[in-house]
């Protein structure tokens, strides 16, 4: 076996040496060239983002898209401004433009529903998940109104509040709170169905088995300002030593419970209620939240009157509910709401004369002067004038406008349904509800007539919280068939296509109804600011 001789080894060693020297020389030269190139590049492009763009393909931070998966929503942190209004559409919603009066004649449901003549059923088609902000622009001169739904796939869009907006900030004093858009807020609600013990079971949608939760995350953004998230501590501070009362029907109860749920997260109140009035007392701030049931807000009785027999509800439309008038000296802020009970059977009386009725008019020979929507408008004017001129009440009165229902395809008892609605209605796809529109119009007219008839100093204490149009888009916010925790309840359509019994009037909690109390807080803040200046 032969191994290499020393001579051969020395030759190989001599041959390898110059290669090492050349390799080192080349490496040093290359490194020097790299530094020279980098120095020249730095001098030529002083903006570091430009250098990053050359090496990494990133020109500006604004071009970086960071996708966040939120259920079925994909959120792009930053987007090109040209994409924001890619799907803008116009929608005119002037409720007074030749709208026919629609008077409900069907049997109203127990406790909650307002039957009405329904428009063509709406079928909401699923949009591609890579969607964008869908906007209805406001043209002030042409009278068009804006209602905009900002999809989370494009958030934050022009209608979404920036992430760094303080939750305790306040909207601008002159900003219109009621024209704006719904946007998806990944932050979610401020409470859950498990953290609020006063939540009525019918509105406990998650506790009743509703499978989706996205409806809890949509928040309202006014077009010209921010509406801050509800700040319970700020509310209790503003209302220290004072009482807020909700007066109305079961939808007023819905709003009152929402307020309690929001406040319960910072302090547990004491129940001081009675059979006549619900009252919850927050000791640390001496704040009272109260509720009075008043279906029509005016005087009602059941005794025989003229040719109207005993047992039929009679309403004296020109007299306020005496229970309200007795209680309001104790209140500092009152939120009034009504309307849905005007679909129920009742007799209307003005100046001690029967002038009309709902689902009751036996004497066909006499003309009916007042129908149910007219009666609603008169009742609003009556209660507001009475409260504004009450000698012992000087509080802030907020009229929350008519809350829309979303029974599609029929009434509550004739196959109407809101099953399967998981997102707000998109602009341009809203089916107008004639009964809701005319009820809203009559309510606003009654409010304006009351304001016109009171002294100037009293006008400032009357506020219209105009939620009707914005909440027309929230067909996703109702319990639907998830009205009870019964594990055997029917939640899907039967073989014949008929939907199960459901509630498409009240609102899930947490849910859209919490926005009403964000607005209430803002109106109270504005009132306090106005009073102090």
From Swiss-Prot:
Short sequence motif GDS motif: positions: 248-250
Cellular component annotations (GO), alphabetically ordered: membrane
Ranges annotated as biased composition (Basic and acidic residues): 113-154
Keyword Cytoplasm among record annotations: no
Any one GO MF annotation of this record: O-acetyltransferase activity
Motif (DCXHWCLPGXXDXWN motif): 503-517
Record membrane topology: Single-pass type II membrane protein
Region ranges (Disordered): 93-171, 475-502
InterPro entries for the chain: TBL (IPR029962), TBL_C (IPR026057), TBL_N (IPR025846)
TM region(s), chain numbering: 21-41
Pfam families noted in UniProt: PC-Esterase (PF13839), PMR5N (PF14416)
Note: Contains 2 motifs that are conserved in esterases, but it is unlikely that this protein belongs to the catalytically active pectin esterases.
UniProt similarity note: Belongs to the PC-esterase family. TBL subfamily.
Protein name: Protein trichome birefringence-like 18
Lineage: Eukaryota, Viridiplantae, Streptophyta, Embryophyta, Tracheophyta
Gene that specifies this protein: TBL18
């Amino acid at each position: 076996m032969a191994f290499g001789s020393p001579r051969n080894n020395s030759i190989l060693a001599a041959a390898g040496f110059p290669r090492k020297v050349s390799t080192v020389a080349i490496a040093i030269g290359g490194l020097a060239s790299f530094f020279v190139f980098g120095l020249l590049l730095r001098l030529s492009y002083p903006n570091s983002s430009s250098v990053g763009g050359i090496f990494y393909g990133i020109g500006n931070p604004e071009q970086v898209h960071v996708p966040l998966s939120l259920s079925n929503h994909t959120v792009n942190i930053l987007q090109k401004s040209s994409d924001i209004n890619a799907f803008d559409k116009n929608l005119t919603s002037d409720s007074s433009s030749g709208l026919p009066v629609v008077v409900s004649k069907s049997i109203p449901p127990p406790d909650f529903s307002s039957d009405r003549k329904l428009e063509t059923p709406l079928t909401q088609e699923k949009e591609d998940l890579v969607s964008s902000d869908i906007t209805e622009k406001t043209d002030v001169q042409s009278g068009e109104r804006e209602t905009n739904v900002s999809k989370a796939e494009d958030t934050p869009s022009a209608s979404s509040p920036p992430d760094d907006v303080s939750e305790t900030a306040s909207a601008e004093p002159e900003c219109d709170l009621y024209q704006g858009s719904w946007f998806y807020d990944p932050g979610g609600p401020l409470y859950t169905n498990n953290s609020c013990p006063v939540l009525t079971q019918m509105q406990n949608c998650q506790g009743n088995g509703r499978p989706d939760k996205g409806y809890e995350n949509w928040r309202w953004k006014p077009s010209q300002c921010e509406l801050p998230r509800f700040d319970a501590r700020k509310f209790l501070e503003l209302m220290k030593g004072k009482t807020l009362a909700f007066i109305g029907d079961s939808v007023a109860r819905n709003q009152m419970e929402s307020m309690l749920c929001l406040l319960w997260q910072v302090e547990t109140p004491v129940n001081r209620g009675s059979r006549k009035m619900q009252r919850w007392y927050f000791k640390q701030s001496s704040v009272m939240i109260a509720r009075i049931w008043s279906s029509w807000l005016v005087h009602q009785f059941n005794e025989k009157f003229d040719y109207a027999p005993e047992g039929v509800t009679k309403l004296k439309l020109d007299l306020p509910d005496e229970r309200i008038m007795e209680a309001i000296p104790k209140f500092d802020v009152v939120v009034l709401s009504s309307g849905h009970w005007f679909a129920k059977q009742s007799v209307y009386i003005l100046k001690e004369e029967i002038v009309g009725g709902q689902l009751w008019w036996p004497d066909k020979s006499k003309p009916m002067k007042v129908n149910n929507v007219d009666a609603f408008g008169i009742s609003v004017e009556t209660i507001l004038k009475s409260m504004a001129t009450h000698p012992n009440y000087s509080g802030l009165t907020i009229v929350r406008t008519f809350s829309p229902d979303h029974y599609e395809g029929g009434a509550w008892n004739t196959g109407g349904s809101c099953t399967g609605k998981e997102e707000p209605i998109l602009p341009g796809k809203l089916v107008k509800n004639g009964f809701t529109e005319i009820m809203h119009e009559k309510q606003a007219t009654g409010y304006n007539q009351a304001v016109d008839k009171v002294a100037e100093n009293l006008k400032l204490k009357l506020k219209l919280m105009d939620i009707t149009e914005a909440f027309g888009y929230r067909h996703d916010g109702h319990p639907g068939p998830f009205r009870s925790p019964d594990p055997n309840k029917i939640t899907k359509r039967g073989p014949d296509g008929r939907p199960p019994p459901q509630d498409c009037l009240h609102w899930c909690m947490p849910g859209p109804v919490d926005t009403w109390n964000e607005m209430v807080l803002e109106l109270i803040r504005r009132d306090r600011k106005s009073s102090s200046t």
